[in-house]
Structures are given as C-alpha cells and as structure tokens.
Amino acid sequence: MKLTCVVIVAVLFLTAWTLVMADDSNNGLANLFSKSRDEMEDPEAAKLEKNYCQEKWDYCPVPFLGSRYCCDGLFCTLFFCA
C-alpha cells in the first residue's frame, strides 16, 4: 500500500514536472496572457521596467530555479545559461 502511494505520487510529480518544463515551440500557453495590464497601457514604460536577464553562457546563481534568471529560450543548468 505504501509503495503504491509512493509510486503514484512519483508519477504525478514527474508528469507535472514534464509538463512544466516542456518546450512549447508555439508558446501556446505563454501567448494567452502575454501582455500585462501595464504593458497594454504603456508599452514603452513596460520595456524599461523589464528585469535584466542573463545571456547564453552567462552565470546564473540558482540552477534549480530553471530559467528565472536567463533570457527567453534559455535554461539555467550547472550555473550557466544554455
């Protein structure tokens, strides 16, 4: 019974992880709400407020947080964006 529960939880976790980390070439989910409210009101100001992102092969401080520090399309692995 315990083993069955552990296996079920592991499968659910890995399925969720795969769906979250999957590369969506069409960016289907990202395009649903791609523009924030501020960006729709003043697109120039929104561009200035964007956070700096790390380019390819740049250092990223926390690899297990994924692509939070890397620019779009890059992923943080082994402390650098690739």
Curated annotation (Swiss-Prot):
GO terms for molecular function: calcium channel regulator activity; ion channel inhibitor activity; toxin activity. One of its GO terms (cellular component) is host cell presynaptic membrane. It comes from the Eukaryota. Disulfide bonds join C53-C71, C60-C76, C70-C81. The keyword Endoplasmic reticulum does not apply. Omega-conotoxins act at presynaptic membranes, they bind and block voltage-gated calcium channels (Cav). Belongs to the conotoxin O1 superfamily. This is Omega-conotoxin-like TxO6. It comes from Conus textile (Cloth-of-gold cone).
